[in-house]
Amino acid sequence: MAPISSTRPSHSIAADNPNPTTQVNFNTNMTETTIFYKSHNPGGESILLIHGGFSDGSEWDGVWPLLAEHNYHLLLPDMPSHGNSVDIHPFEIDDTVRRLAALIKAEARGGLAHVVGISIGGHIAAALASQHPSCVLSLIVSGFNIFTPNLFTPVLPLFVYGVQRGSGFARQPFAEWDRFCRGLGSLALTQDVFNILISSRELQTIECRTLVVAATRPGVSADNIDHSRRLFETVVAGNGSQVVQHRGMRHPWNEEEPKVFADMVKRWIITQELPDGFEVIP
């Protein structure tokens, strides 16, 4: 049987339409613009998949069907200023976390979900687990990179935006840049993304069982192991959490290797050994 998907607004889950789009407002303030999400295969244990920058929930199209085969319920939001949530501004951590926590509490089975985030979505996922530990069963963060502000930080978003709109000399080194070059990034969103990536904010404690992944295949899109370690230092010890790397994967490996990514997610959730190629970072 094909995975069942949701198409109705408000808090209902419909099982009668194979082409899902769900848009819903979980807040008492009914004038607030609604966040968009898709719900696939309701009824099973829930997994929330949080996409990267300049993207949307369709980034997971290669991953979610593989998880639905194992009877998981998949929630795929479009974050503020992205995809079908493009009219929600600005894109910032606390507001996005608030919206996603409301989504989990309203639509996930039992108000609980395993949370998976990649790249900018990893920043959101980590903050979600920190700020709303009661609704996160486990956490996977891949591609977490955070940089220290410097003198060039205020002008960097404008420079990058200008390069994309102008000479185009950069050659799409990673998924976010590829999407950006296809016109999926406004100047405002570019500034919001850089405010998350380049920040001196203090990372908050994460209590749940957590897997931090660095995709370290050599090249400009390799994740920074030190940044992965920094995030892992916020995870409470003694609950089976791990920080690992995969030397054969690049930053956007959820799109490039969806079968491996889905297998990793499934194994982490059921506490099995990770697939071949993952090695613990000392």
Curated annotation (Swiss-Prot):
Keywords: Hydrolase
Every AB hydrolase-1 domain range: 22-270
Skewed-composition ranges (Polar residues): 1-10
Domain of life of the source: Eukaryota
Gene3D superfamilies recorded: alpha/beta hydrolase (3.40.50.1820)
Molecular-function GO terms, alphabetical: hydrolase activity
Pathway(s) per entry: Mycotoxin biosynthesis
Region of interest called Disordered, as start-end residue ranges on this chain: 1-22
KW Hydrolase (keyword) present: yes
Name of a matching Pfam family: Abhydrolase_6
Keyword match Hydrolase: yes
Coiled-coil blocks: none
This enzyme's EC code(s): 3.-.-.-
InterPro entries: AB_hydrolase_1 (IPR000073), AB_hydrolase_fold (IPR029058), AB_hydrolase_sf (IPR050266)
Leading EC class: hydrolase
Family: Belongs to the AB hydrolase superfamily.
Annotated function: AB hydrolase superfamily protein; part of the gene cluster that mediates the biosynthesis of gramillins A and B, bicyclic lipopeptides that induce cell death in maize leaves but not in wheat leaves. The nonribosomal peptide synthetase GRA1 incorporates respectively a glutamic adic (Glu), a leucine (Leu), a serine (Ser), a hydroxyglutamine (HOGln), a 2-amino decanoic acid, and 2 cysteins (CysB and CysA). The biosynthesis of 2-amino decanoic acid incorporated in gramillins could be initiated by a fatty acid synthase composed of the alpha and beta subunits FGSG_00036 and FGSG_11656.
Protein name stated in the entry: AB hydrolase superfamily protein FGSG_00045
